[in-house]
């Protein structure tokens, strides 16, 4: 009887290595595939591609599977990095990991795996896939502290039908134990952090390689100039570090936070205090939508939503756009949400089931969910 072939995306990390071992133990014909999505453009101080490949080969030798490398750098720059730069240039803060999953790991990678004769692909993501009544659902991992469904919310039925997440029902601590027990050479390797193509390098330094600085005024909500910024692209909503302001003598003395961007006047608005009303939003509008089931929730449906990774699901009401053909949606939260950021993803849940989501375009702020009087009219909002 021919074994079912599964191509596993192997990064050199512990999670994908244990994934490959588990599937091999379950009797699958496992092939490892290492993706190179970024061409190293420095001396290797920050990029770990070479060492990651060495780790993949070592793991494959230990567990007895074939492995190959594939270069998706061109696809990544066209489909992910170009959009990343466009969003930052427009003053928004994108999440390239969400787009990378949809366009590279579960599209280019999936297509390549099928060409290798695979029936299914698998990755080391912490999430689950469940088939119910002929449809596929994306669920949170049992270990909610490691759940990565937020980054996977743009996957569709075709992609989910060919995907396995073996770690979705295993706690991270157990994954580490398995790695040690079977003697994986990378058992003690640290989890990767940060955006994949940036590595551990300072983010502002990286971004400045591709986007020019464009200094402008830094103002408070009442219009007082308190400093100068280096370019709106280099700041994100809710940012505290790197603003260059201490507690002003005539202010509250509390820390400063980025609260808004006025693209037309190249002005960065900052406020003092974590609980300032400009940092709180009761409503948002999101576009560029993607629904796991292929269609949105019912208008007025109650759901939970995340506007950033690892945030607790916030209870809210879902609203469809009133105009026909407009796929955007709105969310009205039961409680104000902190630093809702245009460019980030608003991801919806019904309990453990991920429904999908969209890219945040705008968020209403203020004491009652509306913009405070005197706020600049051309803030980063709708595309």
UniProtKB/Swiss-Prot annotation:
Residues 146-148, 308-309 are annotated as: Interaction with tRNA. The keyword Disulfide bond applies. Keywords: ATP-binding, Cytoplasm, Disulfide bond, Nucleotide-binding, RNA-binding, Transferase, tRNA processing, tRNA-binding. The record marks 125, 344 as: Interaction with tRNA. The active site is at 100 (nucleophile), 196 (cysteine persulfide intermediate). Its main location: cytoplasm. It is an enzyme of class 2 (transferase). Signal peptide: none annotated. CDD domains: MnmA_TRMU-like (cd01998). Its EC number is 2.8.1.13. This is tRNA-specific 2-thiouridylase MnmA. It comes from Burkholderia pseudomallei (strain K96243).
